[in-house]
Each structure stands twice: as structure tokens, then as C-alpha cells.
Amino acid sequence: MPPESERKLACLVCRHRKVACDRGRPQCGLCRKNGFDCEYKTREHRPGLRAGYVSQLEKRVEDLERQMEDVLGRLSQSQPSQPATERDDLATTPSTGRLAPPLCVQNVESTNSPQADTAPVETTALTYELQLVWLQKYQPWFPIMHHTSAVKAVAIWDSPGIPWERKQFLSERLRQEVIVNAMGSLHLRTVQALLTLSILFWGEGKWVQYSNLAAMCKRLSQQLGLPTVAGVAAAQPSKMCSLDAVLSDTKIDHEERLRAFWMIEMLDSIFALGLPSYPPTTAAPLGAILPCSDTAWALQDHFGECVPFHDLQYSSGFSMCISLCTVELAPVHQFQHSVIQTGAMAGGPEWQSAAQRLDERLTIWREEFVAAVFRLINAECPHDARAEMRPAVITLLQSQTSLPEGVGQETEPWPYANHRCMYACENMAAKIRRMEESELESCSPCLVLPIFAAARFYIAVAEHRTPALQSALPIEFYDLRYAVAEICHLLQRWVDRYSSPVLRSV
């Protein structure tokens, strides 16, 4: 018989689902009813910081600041010698080469530049380096290209290391080349390249650049007929497309078109949360075709006839995220836009009732999601819990929480909204703490937006903090009626005004 301390433990499944556990042995009632693997595990008490750790960390930060000042000093000395003709070469010299994933990169040569001999070599070396970084860091959570096919397309380029400042200059030039070449191309590779750039801008918090590229991807998707591939709409490809850009001659090409379409729709749905000026997204029909399983997509050769395609709604982590963003979040978008269109006051009894029903619907989906993740863990490989639902709950309800003093509140605060937003923030914080440092370094930039939304809510409702009217931050930061993307330009302006020259240059 287990000791008294262990008899009080809830099983892992009930902990993850946030439900009461009857602590039955060897299986609790929930696990026995649903056929889950019931496991009891003692909670691990994380040790605190070791003695002297904070002082060591402060010393490392000081050393890093000194090194940064040295780098910025060398940068300021070398900036005048940067050839001004290199940027002009992009506009005056025709590019050669072909469009290659994941970046549409062509060499730019100029006989007038004093570095004409080294620039193509550096550009090519940086191109292959960026491609390898993509395959190692981005491909696992942004699976829009077949991994094996992309690996075969990337050659190993052995070249000496490029200085960081030179690499930054070339990287910016490559971004411009991708956008310029995309303006004159209508192909799946163009969509993949723009998606790559858009997620980079997303991670940097450059929402204007992201939304512009997302609009281009949306239009290209329509012109290439990608909604037809996904079974969402009978949109015919544009007659401006060449025939080879439309036809899918292989299963890999067909799957890449499918994944590109769903990635566009998924990012569009996440970004549009809480933005009144953004057009509402439409829910995907039940008969839509979703991406294949992770096992099939990771095969080392072309898909065979025996590989099952698009069997289940929860066949992969990508499919589950698509289901959340395009099906479950669609009612949230429609609800927010209906309030704007009708001019109804948010916070009334009818509004609260409708918002609570949406919250309950998301909670039910989360329970199904947890069960699906357990099935995927047993069948294929583990998947990280999706964080996109957290900003959906926060965005839906944060405007009705207790706003800080100094921020005008049109309606009385709703206790239910306070409780649910705080629970969503705590749940997300618990998931982030369980992630390893290596996972955080290569996680999706889409995770940055939920983290910032939760951190902003924590700061706004904190009891012990600087009053909002006395804070150096813009008052809109504490006004939770604004979405995160709506205040980013104000925060960037605040950073430019108040940050030190060192931080502004980083």
C-alpha cells in the first residue's frame, strides 16, 4: 500500500487536464474510462538559485555590455568604409540564378564595386548557411517544405567565416532580393520564400512588414489555386500563372502546396486576434484536407502508395494547430467583429454570456487536444502544447478585467474575466518553465506573442507596481482594451526615445 503522501497525488493525466482525480489504483476512474496510461509521479520541488548565482549573472551582464560597446565602436569606425554602391547594385544589376527554397536568393555582381570579386562568394556562403539554419532550427515547427528534398537541394559550402557586421549587411540585402524577386514571380517557391520572411518579421515584432507580406502570400495563394488543393474553395488558378506553376506532378509538391495554404491561414488567424481593423477570418469546412502525419512527412524517400494521407483531424501537431486556429478561433473572430459592426457595448449581460460560451468551447477543445497529444506521443513522437489558445482567451476577456487606476473603464469589471485571464497566464507560464533551454532557443516566434500578451496582463493587474499614470510606458500598454499588435508601434517609439544609444544600435 502506498504511503500517505503518495495516496494524495493526482495522476499525470488528471494534472494535465486540470480535473479532479479520484486517485484510484492502479488506474483512476478517468484513465480507466478513456483507456489512458495512468501514472502517479511525485511532484519535483525545484531547488532555488544557488548561492552567488545572482552576482555571477550580474558580472556576466557587465562583461557582455563591455563587449557590446567594443563591437559598436568597431562598427562605427568601419561604417564609412562600407561601399555605398553595393546597395545600388541590387536595383541596377540584373540577377541570375533560379528560385530555391527556403530563400529566393540570387547572386548580385557588379564590376563597379571594389568588392566585386568577394561579394558573390560571401553571398553564396551566407545563402547556404541560412539554409542550414532553416533546416535545423525552423523546419521542425514551420514544416512547409519536405525535409529530405530540401536537404538534397542544399550543398555544403566550405568557406571562411563571415564577420558578423558583414553578415548582417548581406542578410538585409538578401531579404530585399527575396521581396523584389517575388514581385515578378508567381510560383509555389515564391510563397514559401515570403512565408519564411514573414515569420522572421513576426519574430522581430515588425508587424507592418509581416502584415504586408502576409497579404502578398494570401493573394498568391488565391492565384495559384491553393484553396482548391485544400478543399476549402473552388478557386481556380489565375490564367497569369504558367502551367508548371499550377500542376502538382508529385505527392510531395501537392503536400507542400497544402501546407503553404494552411500556414498562411493559421498565421492570419493568430495575428488577427483582437484587431478590429483586420478582416475576419473564415472557418475551414469540415471536409477540408489537412496535412499528412508527421511520420509520412519525415520519410526519407518519396511518398509511397502505402502511406496514409490526411486520415485524421489530429494526425499531426501541425494539423491540430490548424484545427485550433481556423476552426476553434473562427467564432472568436466572428464574435469580436459582430460587436464592432453592431456597435453593441462590450461587457453587458448578453456579451458576457456569449463570451463565456466561447471560453467553454475552447476549454472543451483543449481537453480533446490533450487526449490527442497522448495518442500522438504513443504513436509517433511528442509534441509541445499549443500556446495559441492562451492569447485567444486573454484577448477575448481582458477588456472586461479590472483595469489599472488611471485607465478609463466604461463598464464594471467582470470577475469571471479576471479569473480566466489569470488562469490562462499561469497555465502558459507553467508550460514555459517545463521547456528546456534548447527548446526555447529554437521555438516558434508565434510563441513570442502569447508570452508577451501574458506578461502584459501580469504587469497591468499587478498590485505592487508603479501607477500607470506615473509609469514611463505608454498608457496604452496598461489599457487592456488594445490588442498587442495595436500598441507595438507605440512601444517601439518609446524604446527609440528612452533607450540608451547602445540598445538602439543592437
Swiss-Prot record:
DNA-binding region residue numbers: 11-38
RNA-binding in keyword set: no
Polar residues: bias regions: 75-84
Entry-linked Pfam families: Zn_clus (PF00172)
Practical applications according to UniProt: Notoamides have been shown to exhibit antitumoral activities. Notoamides A-C show moderate cytotoxicity against HeLa and L1210 cells with IC(50) values in the range of 22-52 mg/ml, but the IC(50) value of notoamide D is greater than 100 mg/ml. Moreover, notoamide C induces G2/M-cell cycle arrest at a concentration of 6.3 mg/ml.
Keyword Cell membrane in annotation: no
GO cellular component terms listed in the entry, alphabetical order: nucleus
Record's subcellular location: Nucleus
MF-aspect GO terms: DNA binding; DNA-binding transcription factor activity, RNA polymerase II-specific; zinc ion binding
Main subcellular location: nucleus
Residue ranges, annotated region (Disordered): 73-102
Keywords from the named record: DNA-binding, Metal-binding, Nucleus, Transcription, Transcription regulation, Zinc
UniProt function note: Transcription factor that probably regulates the expression of the gene cluster that mediates the biosynthesis of notoamide, a fungal indole alkaloid that belongs to a family of natural products containing a characteristic bicyclo[2.2.2]diazaoctane core.
Cited PANTHER family: ZN(II)2CYS6 TRANSCRIPTION FACTOR (EUROFUNG), ZN(II)2CYS6 TRANSCRIPTION FACTOR (EUROFUNG)-RELATED
Protein name per the record: Notoamide biosynthesis cluster transcriptional coactivator notQ'
Species of provenance: Aspergillus versicolor
Gene that this sequence comes from: notQ'
